[in-house]
Amino acid sequence: SRAVADSWMDEVIKLCGRELVRAQIAICGKSTWSKRSLSQEDAPQTPRPVAEIVPSFINKDTETINMMSEFVANLPQELKLTLSEMQPALPQLQQYVPVLKDSSLLFEEFKKLIRNRQSEAADSSPSELKYLGLDTHSRKKRQLYSALANKCCHVGCTKRSLARFC
C-alpha cells in the first residue's frame, strides 16, 4: 500500500488554473489522510480543546521543577556549588516554582493574552504587519507557489512537489 502511495505521489501532472487548484486540494486531502492513517489508527479522533491540553503541560512542568527544586534543596552545599556551575539555569528555574504552583491562575491570564492578541491581529493593518515582519514570510511562500504553478502549467510537476504546500 505504501509503494502505491509513493508511486501516486511521484506521478507527473501538467495542469493550469482551476484544474491545478482542484488537484492541489485533492492532493492535500489525500496526503493528509495518508499521513494520519500511517501514524494513527483509522478511528477518527475528536480534537481536544486547547484548554485541556495546555494545563497538562503546565502541570508536568510544575511537577518537574518542584522535583528538581526539592532534590537540589536536599543536596550537600559542595554539590550545590558544583551543580550551579554546571547548570546555571537551575536557580533561574527555581524562581518560577511559586508562580507555577498557581498554574490555574496563570492559565487564565494566558487565555486572556491569547484572546487579546487574536483581536489585535484581526485589527492590524497591513502596515503594522509589515512592521512586525509578518508579511515577508507569506509573500515568499506565495512567490514559491507561483513559480511552482508556472512550472506545473508549462513543464509539469509531481504531486509530491504540490503536497509540500499543504
From Swiss-Prot:
Gene3D superfamilies: Insulin-like (1.10.100.10). Residues 1-5 form the signal peptide. InterPro entries: Insulin-like, Insulin-like_sf, Insulin_CS, Insulin_family, Relaxin, Repro_Hormone_Insulin-like. The keyword Mitochondrion does not apply. It is found in: Secreted. Belongs to the insulin family. It comes from Pan troglodytes. This is Prorelaxin H2. Pfam families: Insulin (PF00049). One of its GO terms (cellular component) is extracellular region. Relaxin is an ovarian hormone that acts with estrogen to produce dilatation of the birth canal in many mammals. May be involved in remodeling of connective tissues during pregnancy, promoting growth of pubic ligaments and ripening of the cervix. The gene is RNL2. Heterodimer of a B chain and an A chain linked by two disulfide bonds. The keyword Cell inner membrane does not apply. Residues 37-138 form a propeptide. Its main location: secreted. Expressed in the corpus luteum of pregnancy and in the placenta. Disulfide bonds join 16-153, 28-166, 152-157. Keywords: Cleavage on pair of basic residues, Disulfide bond, Hormone, Secreted, Signal. One of its GO terms (molecular function) is hormone activity.
